Amino acid sequence: MLRIFHNTKYEFVRWWRVAAGLTLAFIAAGFVSFAVTGGVNYSIEFTGGTLMQLQFKTPPDVAEVRSALDAAGIQGAEIQQFGANTDFTIRARDEKQVEAQDAGAEGISRQITAALDAKFGAGTVTIVRTEAVGPKVGAELRTGAAMAMLIASIFTLIYLAIRFDWRFGLAAVLSTTHDILITLAFIKIFHIEVSLTVVAAILTLVGYSANDTIIIFDRVRENLKKPHKGETLSHILDRSINETLPRSIMTHTTTFSATLALLLLAGEVIRPFAWVMAFGVVMATFSSIYVAGPLLLWIEGRWPRLDDAATARAVRAGEAATTTARGTDRVSAR
């Protein structure tokens, strides 16, 4: 595979408009989903409540399970079958009940167990797992998750500004922000429940995306130091991406294979993490090639390093002329 992508000369940067259109369309679909169906589907860890994973001896009727809970005063509980037809999860998120549980009153889990024993008989239901989170803890976890992503972005910007240049840092952070937004859109569109493991996946992708962008930008910096007479910044970006392409292909293929194994073989609890990681790895690869480079090109054109304004305008004119020349060459080739 390394030899296949050796000494390639693909023109990546010129496809930035197509890449921007695709990503904006996907992010817009996510915003529409937010507007139509409401906010993110948070897990018990963020909303507060009780989650119980149950196993019945014989497959029950979901309507009977719900009627048993309603009779016990547990209104609005979410009942979901997963895996075998005897395995169910019950999520109780009623605010008054959660507050009562947080205050030390009888736990909702006990009420659920008693209600099901009364309906189906004692010993017919086995409790596999129980999670209970108070409303205050859930709010603190939501705030902490948001702060973690914000702090990660800030430190990435600071590191790149010191290591490279603030223009590189800004391009990398904007590219990483793109990855976060498009991953959130994916989570919303496909109704993935946001738990602590999903937040961990998003934070992992922040570092993964930034790392891949840094590798390409490091090669750009090296190529800028070399004699590059007649080469525009877009040419240097294309050359740098092509030079790091074998490494990118091997790294991303390995990482995606690991997440794919999790997706296919892991259980229901870890599967949302695997979905987000698999999608995020693909998007991190895409953004490091088609988003970070064009963003750097735009930033360098908007705030050039050159002190002479006339020279800076000449550089931007040269970029435009190069784009026009490429288009003319393609027409001539036809």
Curated annotation (Swiss-Prot):
One of its GO terms (cellular component) is plasma membrane. One of its GO terms (molecular function) is protein-transporting ATPase activity. One of its GO terms (biological process) is intracellular protein transmembrane transport. The keyword Repeat does not apply. The chain crosses the membrane at residues 18-38, 144-164, 168-190, 195-217, 258-278, 279-299. It is a multi-pass membrane protein. The keyword Lipid biosynthesis does not apply. It comes from the Bacteria. PANTHER family: PROTEIN TRANSLOCASE SUBUNIT SECF (PTHR30081:SF8), PROTEIN-EXPORT MEMBRANE PROTEIN SEC (PTHR30081). This is Protein translocase subunit SecF. It comes from Gemmatimonas aurantiaca (strain DSM 14586 / JCM 11422 / NBRC 100505 / T-27). The lineage of its organism: Bacteria, Pseudomonadati, Gemmatimonadota, Gemmatimonadia, Gemmatimonadales.
